[in-house]
Amino acid sequence: MTYALAAAAAVVFAVLVGSASAETPYEGRKKCSNCHKSEADSWIKTAHAKAVDSLKANRDKEKNKAMLKAKLDPKKDYVKDKDCIGCHVTGFGVEGGYEITEPDKFLIGVGCESCHGAGPDYRKVHRKAGEAFEKSKKVTPRESLVEAGQEFEFIEKCNVCHLNYEGSPWKGAKKPYTPFTPKVDKKYEFDFEKSVRNNKAMHEHFKLAGTFDGPPTPKFHEEFQKDAKPAEIGKEE
């Protein structure tokens, strides 16, 4: 996934949320980053972290060319455009999510909760399970995270921004459509299987401690964990 792909869905204003996320407020990546330090340090370098930059008026020449191809005004700042901002931030239009009038820096960019769902409920499960594992190596069923609203299948959350264009093969596409389509430029073609393996777009995956066990896991879970490096573990503040 290129930077262009991460910024491709410039006109969709809401991302999909999980089953529990509908009534659970977003809280931003700071809470996640406190414990998942390595993942956070990796994410901040990615295209998803910098997604808002492509909406700013002072974007670079390459991005301005993309704007022209998509028949948008390269001189315009789209950061406050409600039809654009949703795919560049976390939780826009949802309780606790990003607000144009009061932007929270921990909700800027396509952050943790954009993929994993709103975090307050399942974060508590992570904390309790982590304490139990640290104390007695007790393993917690991963299903408990699902019950608390954590998402483990991400493809639809990607599609809602990257495939939301007129004539898209994705059946969920609807107005307002993104103007950044494969017809405008082939670099906007989206392949989930390739993109999810691209560390320039996604954060690097690190070795899990084994706190949770059992289903569900994404189908690429074992592949990523096989060669994953140990993570630097932070502490919840």
Sequence positions of predicted segments:
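Substrate-binding/catalytic groove segments of enzymes
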Residues: 121-123, 166-176
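Repeat-solenoid scaffold signature
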Residues: 139-140, 144-170
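Sequence context of c-type cytochrome heme-c attachment sites
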Residues: 18-107, 119-151, 183-237
